[in-house]
Amino acid sequence: MSEQQTVSQKEQYNLNKLQKRLRRNVGQAIADFNMIEEGDRIMVCLSGGKDSYTMLEILRNLQQSAPVNFSLVAVNLDQKQPGFPEHILPAYLESLGVEYQIVEENTYSIVKDKIPEGKTTCSLCSRLRRGILYRTATELGATKIALGHHRDDILQTLFLNMFYGGKLKGMPPKLMSDDGKHVVIRPLAYCREKDIERFSVAKGFPIIPCNLCGSQPNLQRQVIGDMLRDWDKRYPGRLETMFSAMQNVVPSHLSDYNLFDFKGIHHGSEVVDGGDLAFDREDIPMQPIGWQPEDADDAAPVRLDVLEIK
């Protein structure tokens, strides 16, 4: 066997292992939050980025073995940004045989008219996009809207709200849309961004850049993202533990009196959630909860090749 064949087999082995992990993560999230039910028609929001490509690929894969029957329709919103490569997504989706719809709405002009030059346009753009996607879901008869946010996005949102909004509020894996008509799901909620990056590189997805509009990045989100990546590098397992904490909330040991009846505590009341542990030395596990050591091959650096738009 040649060296090239050996490398190819090794790469395929690592890809298969990575895909199994992503499948397991997505399948677990779907089960935990009852994201997909019998007969669902899932509208998969496809932006052309690594996350939405991965979401579509894993959902297509799960379709073949899921205990329930569901259908997929991929939807991309062409917002008429200058230089947007209109041919990329149709060609890719047709090659897969996936049902799809390209929705053309010139929100770019609206945003440029309303937002001063050099300011972040993402907030207004996302509101406009959300309304169009809700309308499209109704037109397509979709029962669920699938978005490509992953675990790291959820943690970023938690810290953004803590640091800048004064709230313990993250990004739910499943919710009712703000128009009260659609169920929104995030199948990648348990998936790590670095796994998605590796998978995207290995699969060779035709990535479309997200900054065609020329908008400046959200500085706060960028700072939080850099902080989390630094923690993940310096303290392996920290992100896993923080995400586990989001699923293990103890309201009686926080300070929100709307979530727990502190006023109702009197002499003779029952001990709740272990009472006061402030004076005890807590048993802290040697390894962070949820952490698993990575294989050397899994930890290889990656670089996403983005299509050059001319």
Curated annotation (Swiss-Prot):
Cofactors named for this entry: Mg(2+); [4Fe-4S] cluster
Pathway(s) where this gene product acts: tRNA modification
Signal peptide residue numbers: none
GO BP terms: tRNA thio-modification
Keywords from the UniProt entry: 4Fe-4S, ATP-binding, Cytoplasm, Iron, Iron-sulfur, Magnesium, Metal-binding, Nucleotide-binding, RNA-binding, Transferase, tRNA processing, tRNA-binding
UniProt keyword 4Fe-4S present: yes
Motif (PP-loop motif): 47-52
Annotated localization: Cytoplasm
GO CC annotations on file: cytoplasm
Binding positions for [4Fe-4S] cluster per the UniProt entry: C122, C125, C213
Catalytic reactions of this protein: cytidine(32) in tRNA + S-sulfanyl-L-cysteinyl-[cysteine desulfurase] + AH2 + ATP = 2-thiocytidine(32) in tRNA + L-cysteinyl-[cysteine desulfurase] + A + AMP + diphosphate + H(+)
Stated family: Belongs to the TtcA family.
Subunit: Homodimer.
Known role: Catalyzes the ATP-dependent 2-thiolation of cytidine in position 32 of tRNA, to form 2-thiocytidine (s(2)C32). The sulfur atoms are provided by the cysteine/cysteine desulfurase (IscS) system.
NCBIfam families assigned: PRK10696.1
Official protein name in the record: tRNA-cytidine(32) 2-sulfurtransferase
Species name: Serratia proteamaculans (strain 568)
Taxonomic placement: Bacteria, Pseudomonadati, Pseudomonadota, Gammaproteobacteria, Enterobacterales
